[in-house]
Amino acid sequence: MNFPDFNNNNKDDQWERFSQLLFYDEEIGFWLDISRMKFSSEDIGSLQDNFKEACKSMKALEKGSIANIDESRQVGHYWLRNASLAPSKQTSNSIRNEINDIKTFGENILNGKITTAQGKPFTDVLWIGIGGSGLGPLLIVNSLQDNNKGLNFSFLDNVDPNGINKTLNSFRDKLSTTLFVVVSKSGGTPEPQIAMDQTRFFLDKNGLDWSSRAVAITMEGSSLDQIAENEKWLKRFDLPDWVGGRTSITASVGLLPLVLIGEDIDSFLDGASQMDQITRRIDIYKNPSALLAASWYFSGAGKGKRDMVVLPYQDRLQVFSKYLQQLVMESLGKEEDRNANKVNQGLAVYGNKGSTDQHAYVQQLRDGIDNFFVTFVEILEDCTEIPKINKKSPGDYLSGFLQGTRLALSENDRQSITITIKKFNSYTLGSLIALFERAVGIYAELIDINAYHQPGVEAGKKAASNILKLQSEIELLLEDGKLYSIEGIMNTIPGSSQESIYIILRHLSNNDHTYKFVGNLSDPRELQIKKAV
């Protein structure tokens, strides 16, 4: 295909470029416009061989090759929406059985066949999960739940004491009819464990039983799975080892909230499966995920030199930028390529929603540093319950603001991608998620990195664990009531550092008043500390 180069000063050339590059799929009702990204037909041609190799790798992944070398693990999120792709009959059957189990459980919760121990129907859900275990469900609920449909959802996705306190206290009048869902693949992630412990304590304090209203989503045989089994929790769902957190939205992690808000699981999975079929195509121009990956590649010179700003012009998709932030950055942010060469790859993602952002950072996007490209997301079909008043439709204005922002950026030579969806529902959300999952996989192949491990995340977890261990050692040391300098503590505890000790002590002394600093607070070198005993 030969198309004109990006030329904002020539309307005819730009119209020709737009028309040739516009991708459309009638089945989904989906358009992708990459015409305002700066690449040439020669650039795309130069990627064709690399793209074919990327497709081979993606095909091998779908057939069950080991993709996460660190954990010697398969990556099977594509099987979740088409169980026949799974490499074994046992896995295929397990996927189908799990989907049916989730459907039955959710329907029985909503129709009142499953109730609290007191015979009351469940009214609310408190979802406890971190990272993909929280972001996927949050996206599902925020984007798809209609008014007065299904259960009311709240989330504990952090270990902030103020946030936990505020959320738990918001349940006082409905605590007895709340379903508690705990998500942790390994069962050993500290954040959901801590949030669960606090929630259980809160229930106990209010005279309510935990097990009869608790659900676990975890890997079979994990510590959480064993707890749920031993304590006879209301229900357990499997999260297979071949599903990563950031791609777990089409697993039980996303399907359970779907059914609990009264949405159609099959429609969601069908949308993802349909996009999967489209994005297996070998022709770049007929593969929207390949077009996205190519746009990212040329925009950032294959090095992620430009940020991606995600601007969905729809309130219900406000969480989408956060969801993509994890999917893209955790997958592509890698220090080394697959040959252990230091490459420091990545693609930074941020965003919120239009038209709000037009009154925030779009000023810089148009007139400031040119280090980004925008991904607009547009939904064509407006809410029919909101009428025109004085011949003015909010939907018309929203569309006008999107097109105006796109043009204003383009006039100043700023790049953008526009994704347009005819109608937003569970089917098209599934397709949108699958679009970006495949784009991430293809882009990772183009830059030769492993998209399916997260050594940086693991390093952060290990460092946090070491800090908590150091805090325990400091607390034990200070039990004698003696006065210690920071230097003295460091010399007593091997492998510690002054800075870490100081930061731990500062937090301790502000939350446990038996710890007292002595000295000049503005100079940590002079401080001493002791515990009243």
From Swiss-Prot:
Active-site residue list: 330, 359, 461
Enzyme class, first EC level, given as a word: isomerase
Keywords of the record: Cytoplasm, Gluconeogenesis, Glycolysis, Isomerase
Name of this protein: Glucose-6-phosphate isomerase
Any single Gene Ontology cellular-component annotation: cytosol
Chief subcellular location: cytoplasm
Record organism: Prochlorococcus marinus (strain SARG / CCMP1375 / SS120)
Its biological purpose: Catalyzes the reversible isomerization of glucose-6-phosphate to fructose-6-phosphate.
Location(s), subcellular: Cytoplasm
Pathway stated in the Swiss-Prot or TrEMBL entry: Carbohydrate biosynthesis; gluconeogenesis; Carbohydrate degradation; glycolysis; D-glyceraldehyde 3-phosphate and glycerone phosphate from D-glucose: step 2/4
Gene name as annotated: pgi
GO molecular function: carbohydrate derivative binding; glucose-6-phosphate isomerase activity; monosaccharide binding
Family: Belongs to the GPI family.
Classification via PROSITE patterns: P_GLUCOSE_ISOMERASE_2 (PS00174), P_GLUCOSE_ISOMERASE_3 (PS51463)
Enzyme Commission identifier(s): 5.3.1.9
Reactions that this protein is recorded to catalyse: alpha-D-glucose 6-phosphate = beta-D-fructose 6-phosphate
GO biological process, one term: glucose 6-phosphate metabolic process
